[in-house]
Regions:
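Conserved C-terminal "lid"/linker of ANL adenylate-forming enzymes
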Residues: 290, 302-304, 316-358
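Conserved ATP-binding loop and adjacent catalytic segment of the adenylate-forming AMP-binding
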Residues: 171-214, 224-228
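AMP-binding/adenylate-forming core of the ANL superfamily
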Residues: 208-236, 251, 306
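Conserved pre-ATP/AMP-binding loop-to-beta segment of ANL
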Residues: 3-20, 54
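Gly/Ser/Thr-rich phosphate-binding loop
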Residues: 137-194
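Conserved AMP-binding A3 loop
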Residues: 16-43, 50-52
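AMP-binding/adenylate-forming catalytic core of the ANL superfamily
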Residues: 232-325
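AMP-binding/adenylate-forming
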Residues: 33-40, 56-133
């Protein structure tokens, strides 16, 4: 889907839009969402970040998914000048920017992408991979450093990327988003650079959060979601003091992992994200932790890696992980499966008859 296609859908007489989930934890799903709730979400984000009519925005995410759609809706609702590039791993590269187009929703006319880019972008959204790649190339890093408000979603921010983001000037506000397709993009933000950098997400004023008996985050966001949403994210809540809190309420949260990313192996509970975080500084090749059913252990942890030297990978695991966290199987693949939005695609891995070597 390109911008023209989406605008035709947005401007038709239907009051709903068809969206697709990314499929990072299973098969992608279709769902219909109300345009009015998308408008609400757009206004909430723009108001919080102080985005004004006539400001510039940068679209480098696929319009097939909610993140790209919402970036466009924000531009329409707040009358922004929108620069569009083809979704890719290096959206700030010369090659990508040379093909950029622009639409001025403030004056309802076309405009020069080059002129807007020269002035600097006021608002952009990217996935972690795009940010990481941009920070790795001096010319792209310089351009990234001139984006006034950068929101990062669609995947976890690992320690290495977080450290790089902390080196950006405080004048550039970099945020990690929390949300999903069902909440029409994000319902909470946490700062990634400057003195306010934190691991705690702060919900918007119109959003309330709690945890259920299983420890999963429950979201009450009536402006964007008609019913309370019970997530699969295991969360911890914290009442912030007045100096730390934003807006009208003081409850913040942090995500410890996903309920469906919990491996129960021989009575030991292993959180997939924690294992990956411990290994990431020591494994250079892309990898992921997943699980499979096992007659003896119930479930067992499996490490999937693009590294062909699985003996070395296993050695690192035994050195860096607690004994019962060490994967029981190691598999080589040519490419770690990813969704179109840049998330690791764990769902259905063992149903695809991938040839394994352990």
């Amino acid at each position: 889907m390109d911008l023209k296609d989406f605008l035709e859908i947005w401007e038709n007489e239907e009051d709903r839009v068809l969206v697709h989930t990314s499929g990072s934890t299973g098969k992608p799903k279709e769902m219909w969402v109300e345009k009015d709730k998308m408008r609400n979400s757009a206004r909430i984000t723009c108001d919080f970040l102080g985005i004004q009519s006539g400001d510039s925005a940068f679209l480098c995410l696929p319009l097939d998914y909610i993140a790209g759609k919402m970036m466009t809706v924000r531009s329409i609702e707040r009358e922004l000048r929108l620069v569009c590039v083809e979704p890719c791993g290096h959206p700030l590269s010369n090659e990508a920017l040379q093909q950029a187009t622009a639409v001025d929703f403030h004056t309802s006319s076309s405009c020069s992408a080059a002129t807007i880019l020269a002035e600097g972008i006021d608002f952009a959204a990217m996935v972690p991979m795009q940010v990481f790649n941009s920070l790795s190339v001096p010319e792209e890093r310089e351009r990234l450093g001139r984006i006034k408000n950068l929101i990062i979603g669609g995947g976890a921010i690992d320690e290495a990327l977080a450290a790089k983001l902390m080196t950006l000037p405080e004048e550039i506000a970099v945020w990690s988003t929390y949300g999903m397709t069902e909440t029409l993009s994000h319902i909470a933000l946490r700062r990634l650079n400057g003195p306010d950098a934190s691991e705690w997400y702060h919900p918007f004023d119109s959003v309330k959060v709690e945890v259920n008996q299983e420890g999963c985050l429950v979201i009450d966001a009536p402006l964007v979601c008609a019913e309370k949403l019970v997530t699969n994210d295991i969360a911890e809540l914290k009442v912030m003091d007045t100096s730390e809190s934003w807006g009208s309420h003081r409850v913040a949260f942090r995500i410890k992992g996903r309920k469906d990313f919990l491996i129960c192996s021989g009575g030991v509970k292993i959180q997939i994200e924690e294992v990956e975080d411990k290994l990431r500084p020591f494994l250079q090749s892309p990898f992921m932790i997943t699980k499979k059913k096992d007659e003896k252990f119930g479930e067992m942890a499996v490490l999937v890696s693009e590294d062909v030297d699985l003996d070395e990978v296993e050695r690192v695991c035994k050195e860096q992980l607690p004994k019962f966290w060490v994967p029981k199987q190691f598999i080589h693949v040519d490419k770690i499966p990813m969704t179109e939005t840049g998330k690791v695609k764990r769902g259905g891995f063992f149903e695809k008859n991938i040839t394994c070597c352990s």
